[in-house]
């Protein structure tokens, strides 16, 4: 197995965040206005496995869209190094990143590609009969995703997503469960007003209370970072100063801005924190349109070149769609989050005194980050915690 250059692994972490927030903006342009969550880590890992088999103009387009600094052969070990770091056993929290290839039994794949995805991503190739048992294959893949995410993601691939033309499904599943370094006192949780959707009318939601955290301010926002036990991962919450200010903050949202916010926070023992409990569970998002708009339309077309996957003489391949689904729950003890991404490939047819208050009583953003690499594992928007 080719070892990863540490600089390439760091670059892949940066690319993960940049690409994920591109997808975020594309979903916002689609008209997704309610609660929303995505996993940049899951999306980038699944598409990095796909990019490993891309060649020619398709590889160039995917490299640009995914913000990758390296060619397919160098990206596979770089992404794999990050996946292995996330999967390293820990006593303080659970972070599991699982990958698998589900391949059509009759199709001839390139041995070198299957070996690379196995060695770098831990993605074993399982043969299924898409041609005559498409629906049973879909159910089997969904069961695998469910088991990898502790049953939080039950139906990644919707009905009709697998058909007799399907040749390969590349799946990534991410599961996280962590406890706050300083837990909220459940006895202090009380129903308080939350101005859902930034409007004038409020709804009563269970709101957690704490004192202390990593706090900062930037133009138009307050920032709170809550570390998880082990202090390797943290949730950063970005609260617009204006009750209806979320849209303006999202207009300028990109990876550079997130890093800027992260650099603003410092430890404060006096900040008064009020944060609603929340749970977000997205439906299965089909992302083909968004990814085409971001610059990789060729990968979905009859001009796609995924010949790095297929054996010589095998029928040409193209991506048919990319499916993504996320679950995030935040409470007094900590956070549970899960995400899954499936790529379906088919044959072509600093504050002043007094002590600051961080009262999240209106819509806000959150980012679950790997504070070592800076990679965004999960990103979300809460407009109504109910």
Question: Where do the PLM segments sit?
Answer:
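Extracellular/luminal recognition modules and glycoprotein regions
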Residues: 17-28
């Amino acid at each position: 197995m080719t070892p990863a250059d540490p600089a390439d692994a760091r670059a892949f972490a940066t690319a993960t965040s940049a690409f994920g927030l591109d997808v975020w903006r594309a979903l916002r342009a689609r008209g997704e206005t309610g609660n929303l969550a995505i996993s940049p880590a899951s999306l980038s890992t699944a598409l990095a496995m796909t990019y490993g088999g891309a060649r020619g103009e398709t590889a160039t387009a995917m490299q640009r869209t995914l913000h990758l600094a390296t060619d397919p052969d160098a990206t596979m070990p770089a992404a794999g190094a990050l996946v292995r770091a996330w999967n390293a056993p820990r006593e303080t929290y659970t972070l599991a990143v699982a990958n698998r290839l589900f391949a059509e039994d009759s199709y001839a794949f390139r041995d070198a590609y299957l070996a690379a995805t196995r060695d770098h991503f831990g993605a074993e190739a399982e043969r299924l009969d898409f041609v005559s048992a498409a629906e049973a294959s879909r159910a089997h893949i969904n069961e695998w995703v469910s088991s990898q995410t502790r049953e939080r993601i039950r139906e990644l691939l919707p009905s009709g997503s697998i058909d007799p033309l399907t040749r390969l499904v590349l799946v990534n599943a991410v599961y996280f469960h962590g406890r706050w370094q300083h837990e909220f006192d459940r006895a202090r949780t009380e129903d308080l007003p939350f101005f859902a959707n930034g409007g004038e009318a409020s709804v009563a939601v269970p709101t957690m209370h704490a004192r202390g955290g990593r706090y900062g301010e930037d133009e138009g926002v307050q920032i709170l970072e809550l570390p998880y036990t082990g202090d390797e991962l943290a949730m950063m919450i970005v609260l617009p100063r204006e009750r209806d200010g979320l849209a303006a903050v999202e207009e300028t949202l990109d990876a550079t801005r997130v890093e800027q916010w992260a650099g603003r926070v410092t430890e404060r023992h006096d900040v008064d924190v009020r944060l609603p409990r929340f749970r977000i569970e997205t439906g299965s998002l089909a992302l083909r349109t968004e990814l085409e708009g971001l610059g990789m339309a060729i990968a979905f077309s009859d001009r796609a070149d995924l010949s790095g996957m297929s054996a010589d003489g095998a029928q040409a391949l193209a991506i048919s769609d990319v499916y993504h689904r996320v679950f995030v729950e935040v409470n007094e003890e900590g956070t549970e989050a899960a995400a899954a991404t499936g790529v379906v490939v088919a044959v072509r047819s600093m504050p002043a005194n007094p002590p600051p208050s961080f009262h999240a009583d209106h819509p806000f953003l959150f980012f679950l980050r790997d504070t070592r690499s800076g990679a965004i594992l999960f990103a979300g928007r809460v407009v109504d915690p109910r």
